[in-house]
Amino acid sequence: MSEENVLIGVIGGSGLYQLDNLTVVKTVNPETPWGFPSSPITIAALPSGTKVAFLARHGIGHVIPPSSVPSTANIAALKSLGVSAILSFSAVGSLREEISPGSFALPSQIIDRTKGIRDSSFFNGTSIVAHAMFGDPFSNKLIRWLEPRVRKALEKEGKGKLLFTDKTIVCMEGPQFSTRAESVMYRQWGGDLINMSVLPEAKLAREAELSYALIAMATDYDSWRPHSDAVTAHDVVQTLHDNGASAKLVLSTILDDLHTTINTHHRALTNGNSQDLEAIREEEALLQERGSMKFSIMPASPQQKAEDRKKLAFILPEHFKDAA
């Protein structure tokens, strides 16, 4: 594991780290047992010294389609740098009239419409079985922490952009957009948003015991409106450009505060410092996923291969101490 004090990982477009108040410290490309990440990871620092790791989900220049994103390597690489919480930014289609293009959302639930093409578990292909809890696919405490701060940042921007919470996002396989029939069906299922990126990211973050939240940016109305043209990539890119500026403002507003909060929780959970423990009681601990895989992994047995335990120790050293 890296000695870098990088507690926050940001996954999104390659331009997200180009903030006025960020200085690039270094670029790293860690090799993991699942290969290399989508792109080299940029470690940047705020004037305060807070470091953040930025990863371009679709590669530099957006060259990797949704079904081919190496999400296992992406999450493992971020964890290897010391990351404890991931903020994932993604363009989404809106399945609700009130969530107009340009709006932001912090979803709380996912409907999985991927097709099994994507590797969705670190345990796949190993001799070790695990069943991670996924009833709440996003980190609820992190979302509650983010909500007032993201809302305040958008209000400060003054463009009238709204923030929605407690929404359900549908993750489709892609790369094609929905048919009109599918889009209408997703609305009937209770879907509010749709994208191609949140899975398997959220599942893998849970297995790696990382807090994970999706900051969704609505770019279009998908294809459910009967009298509107179906969504095109051109529509998405046009709105995404404006949303990108808003995303940068959100990041520059919250990163220092989030780093300080996570650092306090780390100290409290690691050292049991009474002052820090009191601080995280007052403001709920963000690192709720830490230790969550303890009872999800099947007990060690002679049938489990040593090389598999060593592989999984890369992301879960606490649970595979004999192999780390």
From Swiss-Prot:
Pathway: Amino-acid biosynthesis; L-methionine biosynthesis via salvage pathway; S-methyl-5-thio-alpha-D-ribose 1-phosphate from S-methyl-5'-thioadenosine (phosphorylase route): step 1/1. Its EC number is 2.4.2.28. It is found in: Cytoplasm; Nucleus. The keyword Transmembrane does not apply. Coiled coil: none annotated. Pfam families: PNP_UDP_1. GO terms for biological process: L-methionine salvage from methylthioadenosine; purine ribonucleoside salvage. Phosphate binds at residues 14, 57-58, 90-91, 197. GO terms for cellular component: cytosol; nucleus. The keyword Ribosomal protein does not apply. Substrate binds at residues 196, 220-222. Keywords: Cytoplasm, Glycosyltransferase, Nucleus, Purine salvage, Transferase. Catalyzes the reversible phosphorylation of S-methyl-5'-thioadenosine (MTA) to adenine and 5-methylthioribose-1-phosphate. Involved in the breakdown of MTA, a major by-product of polyamine biosynthesis. Responsible for the first step in the methionine salvage pathway after MTA has been generated from S-adenosylmethionine. Has broad substrate specificity with 6-aminopurine nucleosides as preferred substrates. Belongs to the PNP/MTAP phosphorylase family. MTAP subfamily. Homotrimer. This is S-methyl-5'-thioadenosine phosphorylase.
